[in-house]
Amino acid sequence: MQVHRDTRAGLLLPWRWVALCLMSLLHLNNLTSATTETSTQGISPSVPTNESVEENITSSIPGSTSHYLIYQDSSKTTPAISETMVNFTVTSGIPSGSGTPHTFSQPQTSPTGILPTTSDSISTSEMTWKSSLPSINVSDYSPNNSSFEMTSPTEPYAYTSSSAPSAIKGEIKCSGIREVRLAQGICLELSEASSCEEFKKEKGEDLIQILCEKEEAEADAGASVCSLLLAQSEVRPECLLMVLANSTELPSKLQLMEKHQSDLRKLGIQSFNKQDIGSHQSYSRKTLIALVTSGVLLAILGTTGYFLMNRRSWSPTGERLGEDPYYTENGGGQGYSSGPGASPETQGKANVTRGAQENGTGQATSRNGHSARQHVVADTEL
C-alpha cells in the first residue's frame, strides 16, 4: 500500500513541474520589459487568424514607468501603411531636481487613412487612423500627474536682403492752376487727357523714381524729401504743368528729363517744354463780358467830360458873362444904324452917342460933379 502511494506521488511530481513551467511562460508572455529604443516598422498585409494579440510596450525611465498598450485584432485585414518618426521629449520628475530630458522616437502612422476590416460575425467597417503632431514635449512628469505641451517644429522667420536697391522717397501734390503763384513751369504732354489725381495714382511712383534722382542724393546729405507739384491746365487737358519752387531749377530739371526721355515715354509723356503758367488759365464768359462793359462805360464818361470842359459857361440868369447891364438896358447891345435915306447930321449924332456909350458912362459931362442926361436938340424946325 505504501509502495502504491509512493509510485503515485512519483507520477504526479513531473506534472506539477510542467504546470509550474507553463504558468511561468504564460506570465512571461504577458509582461515584457524593454529599454528605450528607436524602431521603424512597416505594417504589411496580414493573414486573418483566430487569435487576438496584445502588445504591451513599457518604457523604463528612472523614477517613473509608462505603459503603451496597442490592441490588435488578428481577424482584421490591414493594408501596408508607411510610418513616420515622432520625437517624444520626456522629463522625469526625479526629486533630485535633475531636469535632463530623455528623448525617444515612436513610430506613428502617416496622415489619416481608412482601413477596411473583415470578420465572420462583424460586417465590414472602417477604421480611421490619425497621425499625431510632429513634435510632443512631455514635461513635469510624475506618477500621479502628467502634462503634455505641444509645440510646432518650425518657427516663422524673416529674410531680408541688403543687396536690393532702396526705393527713392518722394511725394506728388496736385494743385489748381489758379493757386500757382509762379510764372513758369514745365508742361508734360500726355498721350491722352488725364486728370492730375489719376496720373498720380497710376504713374506717380514711377515719375518720382525718375525725377527725384538728384534730390535723393541731397536728401542723404540732410535736405528735405523730394516733392513735385503738378497743376492741371485749363486750356489743354492733356498738359500737366510741373511747377518748381525755384525758377533757377528749370534748366537742370529739363536736362534730367532729356536724359530719361525713354523712361518718360513709357509713362505716357510724349514731350515736355517750358511754358508760361498764365497762358494755361482760362477766363469765363461772364468775366469777359464784365471787362468789355466796363471799358465801354469808361469811354463814354471820358468823352462826355471832354465836351463839358470845352463848352462856354453861362450865368444863372442866362446872360453872357462880361456884358454890361447898362449897355443892354440902353441899347440891348445893338448899334445905331442908319438907313439908306438918313442925313449926314443924323449919322453924326449917332456916332457921338455911340462914343459916349463906349466910354462906359453913356452920359454927358456934368457940372459941379453932377451928371445930367444929355439933351439932344433937333435941327429941324417943328
Curated annotation (Swiss-Prot):
Membrane topology value: Single-pass type I membrane protein
TM ranges: 288-308
Annotated keywords: Cell adhesion, Glycoprotein, Membrane, Phosphoprotein, Signal, Transmembrane, Transmembrane helix
Spans within the Extracellular topological domain: 35-287
Modified residues (Phosphoserine): S343
Signal peptide segment: 1-34
Domain of life: Eukaryota
Glycosylation sites noted in the Swiss-Prot or TrEMBL record: N50, N56, N87, N137, N144, N145, N246
A Pfam family this chain is assigned to: CD34_antigen
GO cellular component, one term: glomerular endothelium fenestra
Spans annotated as Disordered: 34-60, 92-126, 318-382
Gene Ontology biological process terms from the UniProt entry: cell-cell adhesion; endothelial cell proliferation; extracellular exosome assembly; glomerular endothelium development; glomerular filtration; hematopoietic stem cell proliferation; leukocyte migration; mesangial cell-matrix adhesion
Annotated tissue distribution: Expressed in the kidney where it is detected in the thin limb of Henle's loop (at protein level). Highly expressed in hematopoietic progenitor cell lines, brain and testis, and moderately in the thymus, spleen, and bone marrow, but not in adult liver.
Family note: Belongs to the CD34 family.
InterPro entries reported for this sequence: CD34, CD34/Podocalyxin
Source species of the chain: Mus musculus (Mouse)
Cited function: Possible adhesion molecule with a role in early hematopoiesis by mediating the attachment of stem cells to the bone marrow extracellular matrix or directly to stromal cells. Could act as a scaffold for the attachment of lineage specific glycans, allowing stem cells to bind to lectins expressed by stromal cells or other marrow components. Presents carbohydrate ligands to selectins.
Residues that bear Phosphotyrosine: Y326, Y336
GO molecular function terms attached to this record: carbohydrate binding; RNA polymerase II-specific DNA-binding transcription factor binding; sulfate binding
Feature: compositional bias, Polar residues: 344-371
Entry's localization field: Membrane
PTM entry text: Highly glycosylated. Phosphorylated on serine residues by PKC.
Name this protein carries in UniProt: Hematopoietic progenitor cell antigen CD34
Cytoplasmic membrane side: 309-382
